A protein has these predicted regions:
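Beta-propeller blade termini and top-face loops
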Residues: 1-231, 235
Length: 236
């Protein structure tokens, strides 16, 4: 059960794995899925149910939600209120006729971590609006091409942007930097799915960018005009 914290509580609270009492207002049951909280309107709601370890979520330039997942097929276009494919167990609504399946027309291996839709312009134009995902079992950074179709999308296999030759390379989180480069967190450990962390000091961050691309440094944003701030959205 999750919901808006009572009193001075926080959205995320440390405690039991399955606490019996959450002390929240308007509690809502969720067993896998996405929820959101509006800090200004003080409103809490479940967005969608389902998935399996959805470790990556991002928005395209029209505000559409896309999510990656672990073990089950790897990519979904998320519609608020939807009930989606889950790894196991029962859906929150027992009367669901059929859940919403992946938008992809292909499969990658096993688990994905992280998801970012590339809306910058430092990389070649063909990467614009592609979704970048790390695959922890393939030791790779993969891309899918998002093609609009009807009211949804199809995910086509794009470039394998990075293929590591290291069995301990575990890309897990992705960010698009202010310079337009793609940054990948590599937790670098031989145990991919276990609970033991053997190497606690070997994690690394990789930067993927065109040769010679350094971005802009030493900028005082407070001194820039609105037009100059807008121009900084371009990374070339």
């Amino acid at each position: 059960v999750v919901g808006k914290p009572i009193g001075e509580g926080r959205i995320y609270r440390h405690g039991e794995a399955f606490p019996e009492n959450q002390e929240v207002e308007d509690p809502q049951y969720i067993d896998g899925g996405i929820f959101r909280y509006h800090p200004i309107k003080d409103r809490f709601e479940v967005v969608a149910h389902g998935f399996s370890n959805p470790w990556g979520m991002d928005f395209d330039d029209n505000g559409q939600i896309f999510i990656s997942a672990c073990v089950i097929p790897h990519l979904w276009h998320v519609v608020p209120g939807g009930i989606y494919h889950r790894q196991g167990g029962s859906h929150v609504n027992p009367y669901v006729y059929s859940d919403i399946q992946t938008i992809t027309n292909h499969r990658h291996r096993s688990a994905h971590g992280g998801a970012r839709i590339y809306l910058a312009d430092a990389l070649p134009e063909r990467y614009h609006n592609r979704i970048f995902m790390a695959n922890i079992h393939e030791h790779a950074l993969l891309t899918d091409i998002l093609e609009p179709k009807g009211s949804g999308f199809i995910g086509h296999h794009g470039d394998d942007a990075v293929l590591a030759n290291d069995g301990q390379w575990i890309g897990f989180s992705i960010e698009i930097g202010p310079d337009g480069a793609v940054y990948i967190l590599d937790w670098h450990d031989p145990d991919i799915c276990g609970i033991d962390v053997f190497e606690k000091d070997t994690g690394r961050i990789y930067r993927v960018a065109p040769p010679g691309h350094s971005g802009k440094a030493g900028i005082n944003l407070a001194k820039l005009s609105d037009e100059e701030l807008v121009d900084l959205q371009h990374h070339r």
